[in-house]
């Protein structure tokens, strides 16, 4: 910072959230990494400015007013998280990923320092891209193994973590991998994780979660989360990290790979919608959508209904709770004039209209679902 000032951010790599007090200019300067892997909260009210990696750190300050941000309840009840900088605590905000701030003489200024851009080099062949991705992936894994303590890996039965473990094992054959499962085998991934670790010769340290421990842990889990977050995957992750902490202090995981490499089914579905849009005029698609919606269920109905919608309207995740505002609002005492779940994401889609639909979905996920749910859960539980 002393050498480059704010320009230092262009030289940083990896995950971070920090604040630096510049005593020469009496300015507080801080930033958060480009994906928002590490959390950064702040509270700016009544002449107070507080910041921390956890909201609970503010509770000790006498100037902090603890209030429920009830206007955000509709979002929480619809999509299980708040898709913007607000939190469930009134006046407590998240510094967005890829943003920096300065605080001077009571004035807070926030600005973006990095934007995710998509520039496809059409001259490269598929083989060229495969080679480039493999080399970049290997270099990234190697770079993130640099530590002054032992580094381990989380391992599920999925492609993402398996690739990471396999890459680490090339240079560190006896790297410890960690996996968690359930007592009920039909829900457990342990047999697959153990089979893979055995195949590549890596030790796999496991633990299991039963129904009693699942529910008993919830009180601790909610305390660590700071905000209500009903993603059930946080429970096994809590037990996984708790077990791993007995052996290592640093782990690599496969979080974020679906958003980067198009792993979610809705990305491939978007390719089919693109083809449908090319072949069928918009007015016809909208007419077909209206007719299909009124008919009893039949094979392909869901596709035809969504095929007449805008991209942001058919952005539906599996974790939507109440899709119909009327159904949701009957559980709320006040009328918050809240939106349908997909409407919360329209401003994000508006920023990337120039991209094809699958890439739009990836971009929106990186700036909402990944940032405010996936990465937050991973940080809190670890």
Question: Which role does the model predict for each range below?
Answer:
Residues 1-26:
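Catalytic core of PPM/PP2C metal-dependent serine/threonine phosphatase domains
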Residues 4-8, 59-67, 86, 123-124, ...:
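Short, polar/flexible loop-turn hinges at active-site or ligand-entry regions and domain interfaces
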Residues 8-10, 32, 89-93, 229-230, ...:
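Short Gly/Pro-enriched turn/cap motifs at secondary-structure boundaries
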Residues 10-13, 33-35, 92-95, 244, ...:
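A short catalytic or substrate-binding loop motif that flags glycine-/basic-rich loops and adjacent residues
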Residues 21-127:
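N-terminal segments that mediate ammonia production and transfer
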Residues 23-50, 118-343, 377-382:
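ATP-dependent adenylate-handling active sites, centered on carboxylate activation for C-N bond formation
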Residues 342-350:
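A short, charged helix-loop
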Residues 359-378:
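Alpha/beta-hydrolase fold catalytic core
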């Amino acid at each position: 910072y002393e050498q480059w000032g704010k320009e230092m951010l262009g030289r940083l790599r990896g995950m971070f959230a920090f604040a630096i007090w510049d005593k020469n200019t009496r300015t507080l300067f801080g930033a958060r990494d480009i994906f928002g892997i590490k959390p950064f909260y702040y509270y700016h009210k009544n002449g107070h400015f507080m910041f921390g990696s956890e909201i609970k750190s503010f509770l000790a300050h006498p100037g902090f007013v603890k209030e429920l941000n009830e206007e955000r309840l509709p979002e929480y009840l619809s999509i299980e998280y708040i898709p913007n900088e607000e939190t469930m605590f009134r006046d407590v905000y998240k510094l967005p990923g890829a943003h920096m701030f300065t605080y001077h003489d009571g004035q807070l200024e926030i600005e973006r320092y990095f934007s995710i851009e998509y520039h496809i080099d059409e001259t490269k062949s598929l083989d060229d891209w495969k080679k480039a991705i493999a080399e970049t992936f290997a270099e990234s894994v190697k770079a993130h193994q640099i530590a002054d303590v032992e580094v381990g890996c989380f391992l599920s039965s999925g492609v993402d973590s398996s690739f990471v473990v396999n890459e680490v094992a090339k240079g560190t054959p006896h790297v410890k991998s960690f996996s968690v499962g359930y007592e009920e085998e039909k829900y457990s991934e342990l047999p697959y994780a153990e089979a893979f670790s055995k195949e590549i010769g890596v030790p796999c340290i496991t633990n299991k979660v039963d129904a009693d421990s699942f529910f008993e842990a919830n009180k601790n889990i909610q305390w660590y989360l700071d905000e209500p977050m009903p993603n059930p995957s946080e429970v096994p992750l809590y037990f996984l990290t708790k077990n791993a902490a007995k052996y290592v202090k640093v782990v690599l995981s496969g979080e974020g790979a679906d958003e980067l490499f198009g792993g979610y089914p809705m990305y491939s579905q978007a390719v089919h919608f693109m083809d449908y849009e090319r072949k069928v005029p918009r007015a016809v698609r909208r007419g077909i959508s209206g007719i299909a919606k009124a008919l009893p269920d039949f094979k392909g109905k869901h596709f035809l209904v969504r095929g007449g919608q805008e991209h942001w309207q058919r952005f539906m995740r599996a974790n939507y709770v109440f899709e119909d505002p009327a159904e949701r609002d009957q559980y709320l005492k006040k009328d918050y004039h809240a939106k349908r779940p997909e409407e919360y994401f329209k401003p994000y889609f508006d920023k990337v209209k120039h991209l094809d639909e699958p890439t739009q979905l990836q971009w929106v996920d990186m700036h909402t679902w990944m940032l405010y749910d996936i990465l937050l859960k991973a940080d809190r539980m670890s």
